[in-house]
Regions:
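Bacterial N-terminal signal peptides that target proteins for export
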Residues: 1-8
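Bacterial N-terminal signal peptides
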Residues: 9-18
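A short, N-terminal "cap"/entry segment at the start of jelly-roll beta-barrel domains
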Residues: 24-102, 115, 181-244, 257, ...
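Short, conserved beta-strand element in jelly-roll/cupin
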Residues: 107-108, 118-135, 247-250, 259-276, ...
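Short beta-strand His + acidic residue motifs that chelate non-heme Fe in jelly-roll/DSBH
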Residues: 114-116, 135-136, 153, 158-166, ...
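Short acidic-glycine-tyrosine-enriched beta hairpin
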Residues: 125, 139-156, 280-298
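A short hydrophobic beta-strand segment most commonly corresponding to one strand
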Residues: 152, 166-183, 293, 308-327
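Structured core of small recognition/catalytic domains
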Residues: 228-305, 310-312
Length: 336
């Protein structure tokens, strides 16, 4: 009899609460735009360099390690570049050339002005080391950039540069490798061997979004507490402003960082001092304006140099939006 009474009480409670129990649970809030949601079958997720399960894999690494060729070397010191061109009013020094990027340091003399050019499908970007330059980009108000500013010219937007003031301007610039520029109708194209310029029409244009801005003040960014901001990020080109905190000593020599396959990782020191371990080269010490290059399949680990404060390195890599694999040591925590 006791058990029957218990059952009846339970049934009565179910009937009383029935309408509430039968209602569907409220839908889960939608993830923020751009957030990657883990899936049970992770292999079908959109590309990315993080968020999947840890896997142990076999990765191909060149032996001997990938050599540096052409203008590429572990580190270019801006002091050496300036010394090599001492006494010249204007010059260009190629410091990077790979499948994706053609990187150069450039000095323009007072009064110099470039022709307006654009590239069909890729960006031009750079950073001002010293002096002042007026940047004119289609659709943007002309802006005078001084030390510490970066610029990002979207594809199909023509741009011109003009020195401002009585001092030369020195800047770093990355253009798409192996590509010949186009010109607006108002310009006279500079001849290029093996090509002829023909007058055509286009109806494509470029622009900016939350990940891409035409101008960004890195010196101001470095002096602030802000983090995680981008000025350039698309399917072909990525240039992150990687912040590293002050440290008192370098990580142990057993921590190698990570490596990439089939691509270099290049850093321009745009704030503070950067110390980078590159396999086969040891630790290279970068100062403001130096360019550091970790060649394909070489281990690399970048930090601030000990006891020098915060640093920012402008990382230049391809394919970041679709994801780029960071290969880590199996017996160490993930390196930077």
């Amino acid at each position: 009899m006791k058990s029957t009474k218990t059952v009846l009480i339970a049934v009565g409670l179910m009937l009383a609460c029935g309408p509430a129990w039968s209602q569907a649970a409220p839908p889960a809030p939608a993830p923020a735009r751009g957030t990657r949601v883990p899936q049970a079958n992770w292999w079908s997720e959109a590309g990315g360099d993080a968020g999947g399960p840890t896997r142990i894999v076999w990765a191909a690494q060149k032996t001997p390690e990938t050599p540096y060729t052409g203008p590429n070397k572990p580190i270019w010191h801006i002091a050496d570049i300036l010394k090599a061109h001492q006494g010249q009013a204007r010059w260009e020094q190629k410091v990077l050339l790979n499948r994706d990027f053609d990187g150069r340091y450039v000095q323009m003399a007072p009064g110099d002005k470039t022709k307006c050019i654009f590239y069909a499908d890729d960006r031009v970007f750079g950073w001002v080391y010293s002096g002042q330059v007026k940047m004119t980009i289609d659709g943007q108000e002309p802006k005078t950039l001084s030390k510490g500013w970066v610029f990002n010219v979207a594809p199909r937007l023509s741009y011109c540069m003009e020195t401002v003031g009585t001092e030369p301007v020195v800047f770093y610039r990355t253009a798409p490798a192996g590509q010949v520029p186009s010109y607006p109708e108002s310009e006279t194209p500079t001849p290029v061997p093996g090509y002829k310029y023909v007058k055509l029409k286009i109806n494509s244009t470029g622009g900016y979004d939350s990940f891409n801005v035409p101008f960004f003040n890195v010196d101001e960014y470095g002096a602030s507490d802000r983090r995680g901001e981008r000025f350039l990020y698309d399917g072909h080109t990525s240039s992150n402003l990687n912040i590293a905190n002050n440290i008192t000593e370098l990580p142990p020599s057993t921590s190698w960082g990570h490596l990439h396959q089939n691509m270099q990782e290049v850093w321009l020191d745009v704030y503070g001092s950067v110390c980078a371990l590159i396999s086969g080269e040891g630790v290279v010490h970068g100062e403001y304006g130096d360019l550091i290059n970790a060649n394909e399949e070489r281990w690399h680990r970048a930090t601030s140099c000990p006891n020098t404060g915060k640093s920012i390195r402008m990382a230049m890599t391809p394919r970041s939006k679709e994801g780029q694999v960071h290969y880590f040591q199996t017996d160490q925590p993930p390196g930077n």
